[in-house]
């Protein structure tokens, strides 16, 4: 990247920003994928932005990066793209990009994006927020969950993020997995990536309202719902309204008084699933 002629151009010193793209799929040929390239694709957009910043610093330039188009690993056909659920993969990259870029671009919908290509292949170089009839695609809900996050970081590990904000807490769990999207229809293969969790939070005295948002293949993913309406004519307006209602993360709310001020979670997450727990002390609700 440092050898790119752009970084030797005197025009760069006059620039107000640097526009760029980062598509993890440009690393891969799904027909002959190898484990090393697959692993490198996991955080490719974030790593590419870091390299750009490094190249700019070497030339004593501080330019905001505008990430106009980007994508994580995904399938290159309608079926493999739809079946390859990647909520956690998208969230990991959003969290990593937040302090690397000034803006990240999205298409409003897949029609404007021009996603469908020739021979049944998809253009995987960018992301669209919606599908047909305004149906939310997975990245829409990942952004929705990401925008809920606020406060200071208490713990930030690979698959766990704990935030604190004026006595409120948020716990974000991710089961980030990369594998060949062509294998997304192999249920036995997918199940091997399920991840058990055991988390204990201390110091939660009193009574709390706990909201649990779950986003996985069965709670919020659009493609499995769409499959129920596969026909030559496609869904009608009533069915589109039903899809709009169903294609969202699950929400469960409880009120708990943790024993000995300790709250414990024992659960499991499917491949690339996301779970966000939000803790609100009930004395704040008065």
Model-based region annotation:
Residues 1-100, 104:
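Noncatalytic carbohydrate-binding groove/subsite architecture in carbohydrate-active enzymes
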Residues 7-8, 163, 200-205:
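Extracellular and analogous surface-interaction loops
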Residues 18, 97, 143, 212, ...:
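Conserved, mostly hydrophobic/aromatic
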Residues 24, 110, 281-283:
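Flexible, active-site-proximal loop/turn residues at the rims of small-molecule/cofactor binding pockets
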Residues 26, 104-113, 215-228:
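Short, solvent-exposed beta-strand-terminating loops
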Residues 45, 49, 90, 136-140, ...:
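A structural signal for well-ordered alpha-helical scaffolds and beta->alpha junctions
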Residues 67-187:
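Aromatic/acidic polysaccharide-binding cleft in carbohydrate-active enzymes
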Residues 174-286:
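C-terminal beta-sandwich/jelly-roll accessory domains of carbohydrate-active enzymes
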């Amino acid at each position: 990247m440092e050898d790119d002629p752009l970084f030797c151009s005197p025009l760069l010193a006059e620039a107000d920003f640097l526009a760029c793209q980062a598509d993890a799929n440009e690393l891969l040929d799904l027909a002959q994928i190898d484990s090393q390239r697959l692993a490198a694709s996991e955080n490719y957009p974030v790593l590419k932005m870091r390299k750009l910043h490094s190249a700019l610093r070497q030339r004593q330039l501080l330019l905001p990066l505008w990430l106009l188009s980007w994508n994580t690993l995904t399938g290159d056909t309608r079926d493999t793209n739809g079946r390859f659920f990647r909520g956690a993969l998208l969230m990991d990259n959003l969290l990593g990009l937040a302090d690397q870029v000034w803006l990240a671009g999205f298409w409003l919908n897949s029609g404007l994006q021009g996603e469908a290509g020739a021979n049944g292949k998809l253009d995987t170089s960018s992301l669209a927020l919606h599908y047909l009839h305004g149906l939310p695609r997975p990245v829409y809900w990942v952004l929705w969950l990401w925008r809920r996050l606020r406060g200071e970081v208490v713990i930030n590990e690979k698959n766990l993020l704990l935030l604190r904000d004026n006595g409120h807490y948020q716990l974000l769990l991710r089961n980030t997995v990369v594998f060949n999207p062509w294998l997304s229809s192999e249920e036995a293969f997918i199940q091997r990536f399920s991840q058990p969790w055991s988390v204990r939070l201390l110091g939660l005295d009193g009574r709390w309202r706990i909201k649990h948002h779950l986003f996985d293949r069965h709670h919020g993913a659009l493609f499995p719902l769409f499959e129920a309406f596969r026909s030559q004519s496609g869904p009608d307006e009533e069915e589109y309204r039903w899809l709009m209602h169903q294609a969202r993360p699950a929400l469960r709310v409880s009120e708990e008084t943790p024993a000995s001020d300790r709250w414990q979670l024992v659960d499991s997450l499917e491949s690339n699933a996301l779970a966000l727990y939000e803790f609100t002390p009930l004395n704040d609700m008065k």
